[in-house]
Structure formats: C-alpha cells, structure tokens
Amino acid sequence: MSRTEGPMTAAVNLAHVNGVDIEYVEQGEGLPLVFVHGYISDHRVWDDQIRLFSRHHKVIAPSQRYFGTRQWRDRGERFSPSTHVDDLAALIRKLGVAPAHIVGWSYGAALALALAVRHPDCVGSLFAYEPGVTTFVEDPEEVRIVTEDRHDMVGAALALKSRGDSAGAVGAVFDHANGSTGLFEALSDTARSIFLDNARTVPLMFGAAEPLSINRADLAHIKVPVVMARGGLTRPLYRIATDVAHGCIPASRLAVIPDAMHASPVLTPTRFNQALLDHLSALAVA
C-alpha cells in the first residue's frame, strides 16, 4: 500500500487488489466503517461523513475501479457490479477490517447488499440507502412502476450520452435521480466537480456490463443487522427497491429520512448522518 496526496486531512492510500490499485481514504480509530459510493462519484462524495464518523470509527472510503481521477489500466472492459463487489471484498480483507460496518448509497447500496450475499464474512452490519437494483421486485404492479420510473429517470442522460455529451449526462443523472431539475447546478463548485470528474464513467454505466442480480432468496440469507433507508421525497423506483428489500431481509429495519431525496448524503447530510448514527447507536457502536 502506498500514499498519494489528497484534499482532506486524511491520507489517500493505494491498495493493490485483484491486479489493480484501488484508491481509498482511511481516517480515525475504532470499529471499521466502510463507505461505498454510487455512480458518477468517488470517495470524495463522503467527505461530510468521513469528518463526522472518523471521530469514533476507523472510516474507510474507497474509490471503486474506474471511478475517481486515476488513469485506467484498460478501456473499462472489467467495469461491472461483480468486479466492484469482488474488489470491495478484497480490499476489506487486505486491510484486515472484516467484518466491517458497511454504508452504501445508490449503486453503492446495491453493491453493499451483494457483498453481504456473496462475501458475508466481510459484513458486520449494513446501512443501505436507496439501492439502484430491483431484481428482487416481483409484484407485477411494482415491476411496472419501477420500469416506467427507470425509463423516465435515465432518458435524458441517455440522449445526452448518445450525442457524446458525458458532462451533460452527469447533470441529467443527478437531477433525474432526485426528481428535480436544477439541483446539479445548485451544488457547490467542489461538489459538482466530484461528479464531473467521473463523467468518463457515463459510457460504462450505460454500457454492456452484466447487471447486478439479487433475488429475494439472496436477501433472505442476509443475517447481519440491516437498515434499509430512503428519503421521504425519493422517486418510486428507490422507494419500491428499498421497501421490498427491507421486507425480504430478516434482520432489517426501515428508516425513512424526512424531506430527503436520493442524494441525501450530499444535499441533506445532517439528516442522513443522523439516520446512520441511529443505526450505529442501536448496535451500541456509535
């Protein structure tokens, strides 16, 4: 493991896992808390959470393969949920922090669920905020709603991507995931730059990678304490995904964050952080 320079007081480290260098931030001491980011972002999206939770925990926040600003070793051929889940498990084991408390948001929440299914030794508890996976949704009416909502959510971004406007697609992904236009432009320059730095991943996220598949039986086998969390203002897709996953996991608690959208960790971090603190307090590890 080696270090590079980063914008935070925490060191930005490199860990060699599965043949690649994974960048991650590590800060604080105590029980390990691993933050898993979603699409078009990297470990910097968790800066607010890192500052708060590193007071009492060893906080680890990786940038998944192909995300962040590091040069790629290939053209993105291995971009897939399976790659990211396996990288995450390998990193947790290499750092010697298993089982860790896992916090995932959006695509990262889907990866966190898959991690608990495929690598249960790595997970001590799970806080999953609005996972983007819906393969466990079976009710025909809910499937219809999810399908229509997904098309509505990604349509503008796909149109911009097809014109080669990856930067424009980033803003569209952010706004439509939150169901409100203008939010991306209202972000601080620092926050907006994190997402724009990951514009090169837009073709990959809409590419031919095998989608993540988690079924109800998979979720039923998760035995660790879980909080499935969503915002009170979230889109139908994320509401249904969160609620159905909650109903499938035996040791799950549902947390609804008032007046929060999909990007609550960035837009309303105080509310998001309180929900996570409540989870950790219930585990007596806050």
Predicted regions: what is each one?
Residues 28, 95-98, 283:
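Glycine-rich phosphate-binding loop signature in dinucleotide/nucleotide-binding domains
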Residues 251-286:
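Catalytic active-site module of serine/aspartate enzymes centered on a nucleophile-bearing elbow/loop
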Residues 98-137:
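Conserved hydrolase catalytic core segment
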Residues 188, 193-247, 256:
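Conserved serine/cysteine hydrolase catalytic core
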Residues 13-77, 91:
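Conserved HGGG/HGGXW glycine-rich cap/lid loop of the alpha/beta-hydrolase fold
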Residues 131, 135-190, 206-208:
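Helix-rich cap/lid subdomain of alpha/beta-hydrolase
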